[in-house]
Regions:
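Glycine-rich anion-binding surface patch
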Residues: 1-122
Length: 122
């Protein structure tokens, strides 16, 4: 599995597994989404790639740094902004991911860390 290519509901589910949830991708009305099973509560939507309320605690706990980078595109300098999510302050894991969406970059970093540490197996 190439973590850098994960997106959407698939990425959401891998983040959920990294966070210790039982998760699965389900399809309803032609839309795929990640559904987690929360003990004593039941099923819930889980979309860390779209919800900063979910990703902010992950960023703080895992000591991730998130910053923008303006790149040169075919339209000129500063017309393409990507976001870098980096585990530079984490003493046990060092890596970085980039994406046009900051939460996607951070979610990919969380999945990569969980795989490297053995929290989730692929």
């Amino acid at each position: 599995m190439n973590v850098g290519e994960l997106s959407g509901a698939q990425l959401d589910c891998w983040v959920a597994r990294a966070e210790g949830f039982r998760a699965e991708v389900v399809k309803a009305n032609g839309i795929e989404y990640c559904r987690i099973d929360v003990e004593t509560v039941g099923h819930q939507f889980y979309q860390p790639t779209q919800n900063p309320v979910i990703t902010a605690p992950i960023q703080f706990r895992q000591r991730y740094t998130l910053y923008p980078l303006d790149e040169i595109s075919s339209k000129g300098a500063g017309t393409l902004r990507v976001w870098i999510a980096e585990a530079q302050m984490n003493p046990e894991f060092h890596d970085m991911f980039r994406d046009e969406q900051p939460l996607v970059a951070m979610c990919r970093l969380r999945v990569a860390e969980a795989i490297a540490s053995g929290v989730i197996k692929i």
